[in-house]
Amino acid sequence: KDIEPSADYAGEENTDDFILAIQTDKTKQTKESAWIVCADHVKEHSGSLNASTTDEAFIRTGTVTTKTGTQRTLAVNGNRCVGDAFQDFVLSHKIKYGTGKDVIVPYVYFSVRTGKGETGNASLVVTSDVGGSANAPATFAVDVKAVGTPKAFDYLTDVTA
C-alpha cells in the first residue's frame, strides 16, 4: 500500500489500515514480519472489546459495577479462497475441530498509519467454514479471541528496530 507507519500520524484511519497477522509455523516464522497476514478475499476483521464485570449492591451507595477484565475479539469473514495461506490454515481440519492449545496461535494487530497495536496469543474459533446462497461465492467466518491481556505493540520499535 506504500504507507510507512509514523508515530506522528494524525488523521483518519480506514479499516484497510489495520493489519491482522498470525504465526502458523513457529520454526519458519520467528519474526512478526514473516507471519501470515489476513487479507486475501477478507471482507471484514472487526475488532471488539468485551468487558467482564461484576455488580455489587452497597448500603447507601447502591449498585457498583466493577470491571474485572477485557477480552479482544476480532471477527473475520470473507469469501473462500483456496490457496490463501491464512484461510488454508484457519480452515484446516486441525483448527476447525481442534481444542485447547491446538487452536491457540500468536497474533499481531496494528495500524499501518501509526504502527501501534497489540500482540498476544489467541484462540481461533471457526464459526462458518462454508456459507452462502446458490450461485454465490462460498464464505467463511472465524473469531480470533485473545487469550489473556495482549501486550502493546509498536511496529516502529518492535519490528523495524
Model-derived features with residue positions:
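Secondary-structure transition/turn motif
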Residues: 41, 80, 145-148
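Extracellular/virion structural assembly segments
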Residues: 59-121, 151-161
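Mixed-charge, glycine-accented linear interaction segment located at domain edges/termini
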Residues: 119-161
